[in-house]
Amino acid sequence: MAQFYSAKRRTTTRQIITVSVNDLDSFGQGVARHNGKTLFIPGLLSQENAEVTVTEDKKQYARAKVVRRLSDSPERETPRCPHFGVCGGCQQQHASVDLQQRSKSAALARLMKHEVSEVIADVPWGYRRRARLSLNYLPKTQQLQMGFRKAGSSDIVDVKQCPILVPQLEALLPKVRACLGSLQAMRHLGHVELVQATSGTLMILRHTAPLSSADREKLERFSHSEGLDLYLAPDSEIFETVSGEMPWYDSNGLRLTFSPRDFIQVNAGVNQKMVARALEWLDVQPEDRVLDLFCGMGNFTLPLATQAASVVGVEGVPALVEKGQQNARLNGLQNVTFYHENLEEDVTKQPWAKNGFDKVLLDPARAGAAGVMQQIIKLEPIRIVYVSCNPATLARDSEALLKAGYTIARLAMLDMFPHTGHLESMVLFSRVK
């Protein structure tokens, strides 16, 4: 007769232990050792001692939280944001920018088994040109919450300021809160997005019930008084333009239009430097044929087309392909072809795969580009630039190129999101002759 037992949950004792942190992981957590086990401790820096309690105990590692810090690292800084430690947006405001960059670079070097050649960075504060703020009506107080999610929770931190937002957006926060908090539809608001484009500021309001004419008038007056382009979104697919023209931003000498819901890099400064460095690494020549995979609306594709003989961009989202084609026309680029294809399927039968290319750039999502690596190898490009938002899948995909005879010529850490645990990077692979 079979017997069934419920699995025993590993319990943690609330015993206080003293640890010394000797390293940081890529997420900015302090790393310590206790009784032969690795401990990950948010909020601690290298060279700091602290009393901690274990919150999660696994076979190979444990997580802990600080009870009392006993010493401070010389690289500890006072967080600029009053919400730091509660808001889930930032994890590393307590660390110097230099330490953040060094620890992320070290984590990247360990994963890639290669020295980081450079850090591509820009201003560490006031860099974020897009924000999505959750909205929640509190019946007891009849107040509207507006802010970001708490770390590890769906609760909202009511933010009054956010120093990583570009100054124009941070200055808008109290005004947007006051406007939305005066609407009759307070109970039926989902979130509000703020975007700073070169053309001006956008506000996209998601509402879950129809707005009254009084609310619409109030929002329209607010948009005019603050010089905003206003968009209303009754669901996740539709939005209505209330005021404003098609938004656009400057990028590497080009003017790129975009829809309010289109993905654009939130850090304009690092994006400009990243694109410029990618073109430099590829050493684009007037006779080159260049392939850009996971191209989006042409963040790399269009700048590449200003230097190459021809460029092909491949993207899985049809709206972004359409926007890329439109921006090519607007910028007078006639040597660009965009394809709408799913790069997670069999790419060998896709029309772009029949062409020859001298150089390749790819910028996949977090899942990486496992499905296209063999096709890239078949193309035998001289140089490949891989832009990554996930170092684990980058390391995995790199193995295929290294086995095929490519070498890592350059490796850069992209400081796209200072004060957070996000690690982005860019690699140049060269074919061994």
Curated annotation (Swiss-Prot):
S-adenosyl-L-methionine binds at residues 265, 294, 299, 315, 342, 363. Its EC number is 2.1.1.190. Gene3D superfamilies: 2.40.50.1070, Nucleic acid-binding proteins (2.40.50.140), Vaccinia Virus protein VP39 (3.40.50.150). It is an enzyme of class 2 (transferase). Keywords: 4Fe-4S, Iron, Iron-sulfur, Metal-binding, Methyltransferase, rRNA processing, S-adenosyl-L-methionine, Transferase. It comes from the Bacteria. One of its GO terms (biological process) is rRNA base methylation. The active site is at 389 (nucleophile). [4Fe-4S] cluster binds at residues 81, 87, 90, 162. It catalyses: uridine(1939) in 23S rRNA + S-adenosyl-L-methionine = 5-methyluridine(1939) in 23S rRNA + S-adenosyl-L-homocysteine + H(+). The keyword rRNA processing applies. InterPro entries: 23S_rRNA_MeTrfase_RlmD, MeTrfase_TrmA_AS, MeTrfase_TrmA_CS, NA-bd_OB-fold, SAM-dependent_MTases_sf, TRAM_dom, U5_MeTrfase_fam. Residues 10-68 form the TRAM domain. One of its GO terms (molecular function) is 4 iron, 4 sulfur cluster binding. Belongs to the class I-like SAM-binding methyltransferase superfamily. RNA M5U methyltransferase family. RlmD subfamily. NCBIfam families: PRK13168.1 (NF009639), rumA (TIGR00479). Catalyzes the formation of 5-methyl-uridine at position 1939 (m5U1939) in 23S rRNA. This is 23S rRNA (uracil(1939)-C(5))-methyltransferase RlmD. The lineage of its organism: Bacteria, Pseudomonadati, Pseudomonadota, Gammaproteobacteria, Enterobacterales.
